Amino acid sequence: MATQCVLFTDSSMNIGGQELQALQQMRALSEAGWQTQLLCKPQSAIAKRALDIGLAVQAIRFRNAFHLPSWRAAYQIIQTQNPRAFICHGSHDAIVCALVALWVRVLHGKRIPVYRVKTFQHGYPLSFAYNYLFTKTLTPSAYLRSLFLVNKSIDPKRIEVLYPGIDFAKLANMQHALPQHIAAWLSSHPGPVIAHGAILRGEKGHSVLLHALAIVKKTQPQIRYLIAGQGQDKPFLEALIQALGLDDNVLLTGIIEHIAPLLRVSDIAVLPSLNEPLGMFQIEAQFLEVPTITSDAGGIPETIAHEQTGLMVEAGNVAQWAKAIEWVLDHPLEAKQFARAGKQQVVKQFSLEANTAQLIRLIGG
């Protein structure tokens, strides 16, 4: 079974969507008969979560890309585990594993593929790492892949799209109650509900939606907007809500651990991002058959088809956003038909099974 081992790595102390995706991939591969192990920093959030759900964890400090004790630890694990591949979700861990794998190849003539998972790209990408250090770099969208290929020196075969896998069965069976403070607010503020789950940061487009809401309120005075998330823009958004006269229309819910209860009480789900590698909220909304409106930023168009599975508007265009919201409210049957078609598409494109099958193909199963 040692030859069927896949080592996942992450050098972050925190946990977010990418780390949760790594743990989900580990569980899926384990269920498919593979041995998996997570190499990560001791006392990190991902280490705790992995242990809580019964995954194998090995602590490596990954202090930086050239941390010799981390190199030594990775080399020793290779010697004992004989892995089929590394799947690296962080920066320091990816370089450590790539360099150690190169050393193993020089010393022992054994090639160990190293796959680097990247969910962002800032600045101009340099070709050396992507052409020579990593077997392939995996991106969650074709849009993000295109940001790497602006450097014509990067081999396109080295950058591959791996759409995230979503556990739709778990989402469908999620029976958690809506947090009490949200349920109480909705009870005292009747009207159609718009839901938006995202970190409170400028590029997520909350201010665009608020300005659109001020327009919609003229004909739909009871419209409600639930903003789920936390982040640095909270004071700015609170001030904007007050300035636009939307105090009775908008609730900043804070972080919600389970998004399904929020979506189930919503009439519309929105993703007004100004920049987005892919987005997950709109995929989950479509699965739950909530009429969905998104911007056309980044990789979002890969997740929704305009006037087929939802509506898509120009990023940052307040007037278009207001018009789209009004259309959904005025055409509930057509909007619901879009949502049902959206469910079929996202299940096909973003299922856990599709993600796992592609991973197994990559690592040579």
Where does each model-flagged region fall?
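Conserved donor-binding/catalytic core segment of Leloir-type glycosyltransferases
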Residues: 7-9, 187-204, 210-213
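Short hydrophobic beta-strand element within catalytic cores of glycosyltransferases
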Residues: 39-40, 291-294, 304
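Short His-centered aromatic/hydrophobic patch
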Residues: 88-96, 118-119
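A conserved, positively charged/aromatic
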Residues: 106-142
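Carbohydrate-associated surface elements
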Residues: 143, 165
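Aromatic "clamp/platform" in nucleotide-sugar-dependent glycosyltransferases that forms part
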Residues: 255, 274
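Conserved acidic donor-binding segment of nucleotide-sugar-dependent glycosyltransferases
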Residues: 306-307, 311-318, 327-333
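A short, well-ordered alpha-helix in the C-terminal region of glycosyltransferases
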Residues: 320, 327, 334-349, 355-361
